[in-house]
Each structure stands twice: as C-alpha cells, then as structure tokens.
Curated annotation (Swiss-Prot):
Mg(2+) binds at D52, E165. GO terms for biological process: NAD biosynthetic process. Deamido-NAD(+) binds at R140, K173, D180, H260, K261. This is NH(3)-dependent NAD(+) synthetase.
Length: 275
C-alpha cells in the first residue's frame, strides 16, 4: 500500500460522494450522538463566515431541528458563537452565514481582550510572543470560550475538521483542533462545497479564498499560500488521483510532520514518532 493509499484510508476519504447522502450521514451522526447521551442539551460551534463553519453549523441546526420535532424535547439547542478578534474583516460574511444557518441562539465573545491579557502576563514572565504563536493563542482562546459556553449549557463543542485540513495538520493543537465531535471528517474541500451547494448556501460563502486569519503581520493570509499547495491539489490527492511529484511530496511532508496533531498525547506505548 502506498503512502497515499494509507493516508486516504486513515482519513476515510472517498473519491466521489453523493451530497444528499453525506448531508444525511452527518445529520444522523449528530442526532445519534445526542440520543446516546441525553444529558447533552446543546451543540456549540464557532462561526467565522467561512466554508467549514458554515457547513458544520447548518448540519448542527438541521440535527437539532429534527430531534426536537421527533422527540418533543424543546431543551435541545444549537448555539452559534461569534468569536472576533477586535473587528472582523469579513463581518458581512459572518452575518450572511448566520442568516443561512438560522441558529437557535447566537452569542458573541470578542477574544481580543483575553488574548492581550494573556500576552501581557507572559511578557511580564519574560516571554515575548511571536506573531505566529500569538495566532495560536487566538485559536486557543476561541476554543476556551466555546468550552465555557458548552460547560454552562450542557453542551459539546463541534469541530470543522475535514480530510483536506487533517491531512496537512492545518489547525492549532488544542485550538480549533480540540473539539468533541467532527461531523465533516472524511470530506475534502470540494466535497464540502458540494454539500453547501445542495443546501442552497449563498455561493460567496464557499467560493471565497479560505484563510485562518490568525497572524497580525499577514492578515487574511490564504491557506493555500501558507501550505504551499492548493486545495485542488489536496483534494485530487485525497481522491486517489495522480498529482505532480512535488505536490505529493509537499502534502506527504505536511502529513508526516503533523501526525502528533491527529493523535492523543504521546505515551510510552506509542511508536509512530520514532524514526
């Protein structure tokens, strides 16, 4: 088995999908989880206005709507969390995503004050954060807020990780990567677009250039620039297609060096890290 085949198997990626079937699969997955653990009353998700959180948010609200109708349990809710750092550059996209999702509840937590306070406390301890590490601080502060909300609403935190993100480890460890349940896992980027199209999502929300937008020195830096490969390259690779050798090498290097992000903390029983 080639490394490409191993990666595809590990991430559960498929060369092609039926959008309606995958929507149903994700919604039923979320419903089944909530029914298995009836003490869970809410799904909590940060909404950025980008493709992934828009899709995950819509699926969450669909699951909650169906469960309420089927069970009569009105205590179930989906909580969409706005998490700007100061003023969000693509504020209108976020508002458009909220309008599309129609969440039961929308909360806004501006993380800038908390991030700056943490940075100042570290500075006083003799640690000066780089712009890149400050970006990770933002991602972790966002997740901290979501877990606080989940803790106070008997909820779980929903993630947006998918195969095209997981393969490169393009998420912050214990930031946006630290979630309870990931309904998009297995899909690549173009497949996520297919689901949103089937759900009649406004096109600009999934045709915009993806960006983590964590670095102050490089605001709105496109993911594809940071990764050195395009999502079309990554999706082709995940679909088992032949890609240029340099592209495959870049993707596989990302996969191998970020393996620790896709695993729980390393113990004496692990050997994946040994060379």
């Amino acid at each position: 088995m080639t490394l490409q085949q191993q990666i595809i198997k590990a991430l559960g990626a498929k060369p092609q999908i039926n959008a309606e079937e995958e929507i149903r699969r994700s919604v039923d997955f979320l419903k089944s989880y909530l029914q298995t653990y009836p003490f869970i009353k809410s799904l909590v998700l940060g909404i950025s206005g980008g493709q992934d959180s828009t899709l995950a948010g819509k699926l969450c609200q669909m699951a909650i709507n169906e469960l309420r109708q089927e069970t009569g349990n009105e205590s179930l809710q989906f909580i969409a969390v706005r998490l700007p750092y100061g003023v969000q550059a693509d504020e209108q996209d976020c508002q458009d995503a909220i309008a599309f999702i129609q969440p039961d509840r929308v909360l806004t937590v501006n993380i800038k004050g908390a991030v700056l306070a943490s940075e100042q406390a570290l500075r006083e301890a003799g640690i000066e954060l780089s712009d890149f590490v400050r970006g990770n601080e933002k991602a972790r502060e966002r997740m901290k807020a979501q877990y606080s909300i989940a803790g106070m609403t008997s909820g779980v935190v929903v993630g947006t990780d998918h195969a095209a993100e997981a393969i490169t480890g393009f998420f912050t460890k214990y930031g946006d990567g630290g979630t309870d349940i990931n309904p998009l896992y297995r899909l690549n980027k173009r497949q996520g677009k297919q689901l949103l199209a089937a759900l009649a999502c406004p096109e600009h929300l999934y045709k915009k250039a993806p960006t983590a937008d964590l670095e102050d020195d490089r605001p709105s830096l496109p993911d594809e620039v940071a990764l050195g490969v395009t999502y079309d390259n990554i999706d082709d690779y995940l679909e088992g297609k032949n890609v240029p050798q340099q592209v495959a090498r870049t993707i596989e290097n990302w996969y191998l060096k970020t393996e620790h992000k896709r695993r729980p903390p390393i113990t004496v029983f692990d050997d994946f890290w040994k060379k």
